[in-house]
Amino acid sequence: MGYSVVAGAAGRLLFGYDSFGNVCGKRNSPVEGAPLSGQDMTLKKHVFFMNACNLEVKDRGRGPMALCVSSCPEKQLDTLEEVQLFANINGSFLCVYSLNSFNYTQSPSADRLCPRLPVPPSKPFPLFNRCIPQTPECYSLFASVLLNDADALHRILSGIMAGRDTILGLCAFVFALSLAMLFTFRFISTLLVHIIISLVILGLLFVCGVFWWLYYDYTNDLSTELDTEKENMKCMLAFAVITTVVTVVLLALIFTLRKRVKLTVELLRVTNKAISRCPFLLLQPLWTFAILVFFWVLWVAVLLSLGTAGTAQVMEGGQVEYKPLSGIRYLWWYHLIGLIWTSEFILTCQRMTVAGAMVTCYFNRNQNDPPARPILSSLSTLFCYHQGTAVKGSLLLTVTRIPRVIFMYIYSTVKERHSAWPRGEFRCSYCGLWCLTNYPYHLNQDAYAAAAINGTDFCTSAKDAHTIISKNSSHLTSVNCFGNFIIFLGKVLVVCFSVFGGLMAFNYNRALQVWAIPLLLVAFFAYLAAHSFLSVFETVLDTLFLCFAVDLETNDGSSEKPYFMDPGFLSFVKRTDHFNNARSQGHKNSLPNEEGTELRPIVR
């Protein structure tokens, strides 16, 4: 991160720069060998291309001549006299800096140092702060050369920066929607669950239909000539296929579990009753969300620095070109891994904090005298003793997700070929990797709760949790999955609304933005934000069942060894289908505990 900030120059991407190494809108330092560099461009914030209608693809290491100007010419300028008048009135000089505006009509070199006539009308656009020609024929050539000639990384970064206001607005919308979903689950009812399921079904069908409609619109648009538009079209097809598959799978699951709605509502009410013992747990996602936002802003800033890292080289005529540093342009893979790992680590710290607080509240004999400051106590334990556990757990999730990313990249290459055999192999492998990714997630959650109970390391806690859950899987797994599925539908609902808002917002500027990447960024942010808020219920639910399993192993409900569990929770589990068989198995394998009031290790 430090090297990218030092070597990069995000200002060139944010504000644009001219052909002499000057960043527009900034005070610049001189470049040795470039006499027109090092100028004060504070008042000149726009990039103007002298031959906007006659650009050619870069050759001989030189790009089109660009200048920093204070304003773009909004009307066509047909003669040098009009160019001179525009400079005198607006203070915007459209000729090379070395030529004084008084000499625009007198100097014999004016034809070479001034823009080619006629100068088309243009307007500023936030894509590198460039002056974009407004005449259709000029705009078409201008955009095709500049956008198609730029590499993929710079097109992605420019799309993010051009839509930064929209992205920030959508992030605020995601925050409000996630907060509303949090309070919806806090006061859950059968009606609310049916409403959530209905909205998820409608949202998935609507978003899926919008993706296919936009893809059809792109394929039938005869003006689709830019690489950015073609990339958007490919991404649109990928989004449409993915959303269709997800919609079909979720609809099948919803149809299968439709008769379990009443049981799920009762389970979530039990979870809310446990949360009521420690109500400040619902504020924990706010801190997590704030930390995630800070980290994501920092991550994007470093990404901008990576994309602009380069050394200034003086070319013929005193022009300056920035050559990318060898190797640093490929560090974005390393940067992407850092995004996944650090985000998972932050979310893991929240899960361990919630799990520790719930364990403290669960194993408390006197329900009328709750433990003091369980959240602060759990945070203290996390930072003092369990940082390694959080790092290992988040690393495990990251390692299992990296192969999925690699396979998606390979599949995008293989699918261009006509051989069905490699495509089928990759699809099967990807499904296997998806299952491999989801298993460690649930194993990690149980490991965090076990670490909070026993104070053991990650590997020992994961082994103990797996053992105790396996003994009680007949009733724990079947009941737990229903609640987690409804919580997952809440996350899907947040993503659907945010993606729909992004589609409506980004589609307006689709010709000049690689807006498929910002849309994917918004969807990723929406899922992580919703996951940050709603994972409180998941963590409480998983921790409750693990504590319940430990309670069954160490106590038998007698007066000598009473249960720690709430009577309402025990009554709920008894009403599940498989509880009686699991109950007898639990007594058979119960561990001795002389007093029944001291928590012993999960596995002996």
Swiss-Prot record:
Cysteine-cysteine disulfides:
none
The residue ranges flagged as biased composition, category Polar residues, are 581-592
**What is the superkingdom listed in this entry's lineage?**
Eukaryota
Main location class: membrane
Q: Which InterPro entries match?
A: Choline_transptr-like
Sequence segments annotated as region (Disordered): 581-604
* Residue stretches spanning the membrane: 165-185, 195-215, 237-257, 286-306, 330-350, 485-505, 514-534
**Membrane topology category:** Multi-pass membrane protein
GO terms (BP aspect): transmembrane transport
List UniProt keywords, sorted A-Z.
Glycoprotein, Membrane, Transmembrane, Transmembrane helix
Subcellular location as annotated: Membrane
A GO term from the CC aspect: membrane
Report where it is expressed, by tissue: Expressed in colon, kidney and ileum.
State whether keyword Glycoprotein applies. yes
Q: Which residues are glycosylated?
A: 90, 103, 454, 472
GO MF: organic cation transmembrane transporter activity; transmembrane transporter activity
So what family is this one in?
Answer: Belongs to the CTL (choline transporter-like) family.
Q: What is this protein called?
A: Choline transporter-like protein 3
Organism (species): Rattus norvegicus (Rat)
Query: Lineage of the source organism?
Result: Eukaryota, Metazoa, Chordata, Craniata, Vertebrata
Gene behind this protein: Slc44a3
